[in-house]
A protein has these predicted regions:
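Membrane-integrated ABC transporters
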Residues: 1-24, 41-66, 80, 84-88, ...
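Cytosolic ends of transmembrane helices, especially the final helix of ABC transmembrane type-1 domains
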Residues: 222, 246, 266, 287-323
Length: 591
């Protein structure tokens, strides 16, 4: 994962840290040699008087060489340390970019059903956090590599004097490692178990202080309710976290105390050996320094290892997310989408219910959408109209029956090509905090640089009138999320969304409640243009307003997940069935 982010930086980081790892023991060994040389020179029977005499005598040449070597190593250590910090910051930034891009790409490949599943949302939330929260783990891994080499070099020096010193030091620190691993696992289990509550807590914090909800929070006085609910969840999490940390504090303090006793036992042995003359002052300096550094390094390694093991538990959430595979994908021998579509789209006894739901969203659904025809779907909320659109665009696959495009199952076609052939605008379209041009260009993002195409799509949707009023025109940032942004009315946003569908220039055009936020005149103009511009295309229109669907070639009445009746407006009114009943109910509001 790190290598994939930046091979060059990763290799440079490893080499720099390997060089830096052997510098401490080298400097300490040279320090020992300097002390021994000073003691030797001080014990000479005849010694030069002044510094210049020492220099001229040549007796201090070796000492001068040692001091110069130590100075060189000190300067090299400082320089390499700065290079390591520089490379580490760059590598971490590259890893953030690499992981974030990979997460976005993988999320785009997953099924819509995954995003509508609460369990998946918990996993996605944990994965998002790991792309940022665990990035320091890279630096810790590299530091562990460096410290491991340094420990090996110091350990080799201690073993040369007495192997038991290293063994004693390692045994003293093992209980600390075990204890740290235990508490890391406890904290991870707590965070994993409370992921749904954390998502709710973050959601409450977001809606309590965001522009989208600010009006209702103020008007309905929701601040106290949201604040108290947030505090309740946060305090619950805090209480459990505090209990675990209290236990960790007590246990780890005891284990660390035991390790300290072992350390000072070994230190007393070194002093005793020096007093008996078995070790020189230089040896004492080297051994005490090595033992002190080695104790700190091993303790740091064990702590870092336990910390990394704890963080690796969290990274497992990221890997699990990447392991998820979509159920909806292109077959190995995928067919190209016919150009043009000749016969149309047929629903044959289609049944579907959403994951985890007992009620069928659509059942025994059969109808034919002929090529070049405009069909309107009408019906009450929950009848299954939007589900039909999701099935048509293969956001879901039917559990029963099949959907045919020119006589072949939709599942036989290349998925990307199929979705490129269908332009859909849902009633809950996205309001992108981008420029007006980019809001339209998202309909066919590969043509983002084609400003003429964007202008043409805007004109078709009457969005050009909206954009003409903006100070910066097509380059104006829309939405209030960023400083330069200007918010739009619901109807203005809707025109931008409709322009997005025209930008796609797809063979099949689907508008799901496209004019819900438009006034009657604007709606009439949009549908007139839609009728004119959809000539030669296959179009599916969903609307609650019966005045809007009259222009369709055919109207299908959807109820309880199946087509109850179909025909032209006049035919359906004449039959005095469900369509006539709904039409009359709506018409009463205008009388």
């Amino acid at each position: 994962m790190v290598w994939r982010a930046s091979p060059g930086l990763t290799l440079a980081m490893i080499l720099l840290r390997l060089v830096r790892a052997v510098l401490p023991v080298s400097m300490l060994w040279i320090g020992k040699l300097i002390i021994d040389e000073v003691v030797r020179l001080g014990a000479l029977q005849t010694r030069p008087e002044g510094v210049s005499d020492w220099w001229q005598s040549g007796l201090a040449d070796y000492l001068g060489l040692l001091i110069a070597a130590e100075l060189g190593l000190a300067l090299a250590s400082d320089l390499i340390g700065r290079l390591v910090g520089y490379a580490d910051s760059l590598l971490q930034e590259r890893l953030v970019i690499s992981l974030s891009v990979r997460l976005m790409d993988h999320a785009a490949d997953l099924d819509l059903a995954s995003f509508e599943d609460a369990g998946f949302q918990d996993r996605l939330d944990r994965a998002r956090r790991q792309t940022m929260g665990r990035i320091p783990l890279v630096g810790q891994m590299m530091q562990q590599l460096q410290d491991g080499v340094t420990v090996a070099s110091f350990g080799a020096g201690l073993i040369a004097y007495n192997p038991w010193l290293v063994i004693l030091l390692a045994v003293a620190l093992i209980p600390t490692l075990i204890g740290q691993l235990h508490f890391n696992a406890m904290l991870y289990q707590m965070n994993w178990r409370r992921a749904p509550e954390r998502r709710e807590r973050d959601y409450l914090r977001m809606i309590g202080a965001t522009s989208e909800s600010a009006k209702e929070v103020k008007i309905f006085g929701l601040n106290r309710f949201l604040r108290d609910r947030y505090r309740e969840l946060a305090e619950r999490f805090y209480a459990e976290n505090r209990a675990i940390n209290r236990r960790q504090l007590a246990v780890m303090a005891a284990l660390t105390g035991i390790g300290t006793l072992f350390y000072y036992g070994a230190y007393l042995w070194i002093i005793a050996r020096t007093l008996t003359g078995a070790l020189s002052l230089g040896d004492l300096t080297f051994l005490s320094g090595s033992f002190l550094r080695l104790r700190g390094l091993i303790e740091g390694l064990l702590t870092s290892f336990s910390d990394m093991a704890g963080q690796a538990l969290y990274l497992d959430d990221l890997y699990r997310f990447f392991d998820e595979v979509p159920a909806i994908a292109s077959p190995a021998d995928a067919l190209p989408v016919p150009l043009p579509i000749r016969h149309g789209i047929t629903f044959e006894d289609v049944g579907f219910r959403y994951p985890g739901a007992e009620r069928w969203a659509v059942r025994h659904l059969s109808f034919h959408l002929r090529a070049g025809e405009t069909v309107a779907l009408v019906g009450e909320n929950g009848a299954g109209k939007t589900t039909i659109v999701k099935l048509l665009s293969r956001l879901y696959d039917p559990a029963e029956g099949r959907i045919l495009l020119d006589g072949r199952d939709l599942r036989d076609y290349d998925l990307d090509a199929l979705r490129a052939a269908i332009g859909v605008i849902f009633q809950d379209f996205v309001r992108y905090a981008m420029s007006a041009a980019d809001n339209i260009a998202t309909g066919r993002i590969e043509a983002r640089a084609d400003r003429d195409r964007i202008r043409a799509a805007a004109a078709r949707a009457l969005a050009d009138q909206v954009i003409a009023k903006l100070p910066e025109g097509y380059d104006q940032m829309v939405g209030k999320r960023f400083a330069r942004g200007l918010d739009l009315s619901g109807g203005e946003w809707q025109k931008l969304a409709i322009a997005r569908a025209y930008m796609r220039d797809a063979q099949v055009l689907v508008l799901d409640e496209p004019t819900a936020a438009l006034d009657a005149r604007a709606e009439f103009e949009v549908f007139q243009r839609f009728k004119d511009l959809s000539q030669g295309r296959t179009a599916l229109l969903i609307s609650h307003r019966f005045s809007s669907v009259r222009m369709a070639d055919r109207i299908a009445v959807v109820e309880d997940g199946h087509v109850l009746d179909e025909g032209t407006h006049d035919e359906l009114v004449a039959r005095e069935g469900r369509y006539r009943e709904l039409f009359d109910l709506q018409a009463q509001g205008y009388r």
